[in-house]
């Protein structure tokens, strides 16, 4: 999901969960992966992401563990680059995929 808010927020990415332990773990892992990747690829820039519970239809009505991610404000020219540039889209997809692998491995340990 791409955030369509008109005003620039200082948050880079919003990670929403259902409130269940598994969903919270997944979104916290996502935030940690993104934070680590931002530190590596954009040192000194910092990363601001938030994890919170949201009562969204798509989260409530999904059987597997779910997360909803807002990647930016489409009306902001800097955030647009996350979506418009194919390398950026691929990086985001890779980071999200990495999160699922980490989350799965953590789940198997339990």
Label each residue range with its predicted role.
Residues 1-110:
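Active-site-proximal helix/loop segments of hydrolytic enzymes
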